[in-house]
């Protein structure tokens, strides 16, 4: 498969056959490029099961076919308490997390794993990536795309609870004065992928 990089635009173009039609029929037809926070958030809000639940990201990429975006991926620094059992506090340089990954339902088979691979190649041009962390919600997924992308399965995370008030998660602050309840959160499948410098 031909890969060509255009370092001036930060794009990594995937081979696109002639007369490919107006919709992608192969994951190889996408062009992956950096996108703005706004573009990523709008796409993720529409296509990710969590919607726009707050998350912090530093690097974001989109999968395009022509002018249409079919996927968005966001990378950011992992929450230090979430990965504290994996590394010492002084050993977290070069560690990022896939904060969100979303693709349209009309994206061709294997699009997610290919999109991850190309996005990581672009990311490594901007950031000295040593380790990539990602999670799959055990109530919805088993992490097939991460396994297909070469991630190592570590296991399930510890059970956590969220405080719910009026049908919504109370994200921050004191809860003792609120009329709500603690609800167990589904565990997450934890995956890691390491990279040599």
What role is predicted for each listed range?
Residues 2-4:
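Glycine-focused motif/segment detector
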Residues 8-9, 21:
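Short, positively charged low-complexity motifs
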Residues 14-58:
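Short amphipathic alpha-helix that is part of the acyltransferase structural core
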Residues 31-35, 76-183:
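Acyl-donor binding region in acyl/amide transferases
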Residues 44, 57-77:
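Conserved beta-hairpin
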Residues 58, 186-191:
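Short hydrophobic/aromatic beta-strand or adjacent loop that forms the aromatic wall/cage
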Residues 192-197:
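Short beta-strand-to-coil "C-cap" segments at the C-terminal boundary of structured domains/repeats
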């Amino acid at each position: 498969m031909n890969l060509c990089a255009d370092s001036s635009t930060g794009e990594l173009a995937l081979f696109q056959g002639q007369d490919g039609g107006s919709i992608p029929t192969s994951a190889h037809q996408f062009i992956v490029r950096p996108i703005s926070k706004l573009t990523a958030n709008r796409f993720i809000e529409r296509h990710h099961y969590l919607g726009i639940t707050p998350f912090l990201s530093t690097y974001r990429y989109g999968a395009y076919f022509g002018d249409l975006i079919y996927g968005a991926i966001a990378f950011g620094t992992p929450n230090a308490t979430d990965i504290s059992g994996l590394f010492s506090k002084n050993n977290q340089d070069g560690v990022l997390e896939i904060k969100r990954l979303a693709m349209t339902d009309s994206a061709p088979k294997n699009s997610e794993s290919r999109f991850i691979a190309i996005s990581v190649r672009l990311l490594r041009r901007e950031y000295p990536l040593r380790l990539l962390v990602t999670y799959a919600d055990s109530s919805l997924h088993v992490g097939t795309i991460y396994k297909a992308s070469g991630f190592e399965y570590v296991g399930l995370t510890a059970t956590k609870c969220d405080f719910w008030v009026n049908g919504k998660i109370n994200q921050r602050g004191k809860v003792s004065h609120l009329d709500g309840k603690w609800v167990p959160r589904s565990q997450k499948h934890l995956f890691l992928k390491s990279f040599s410098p």
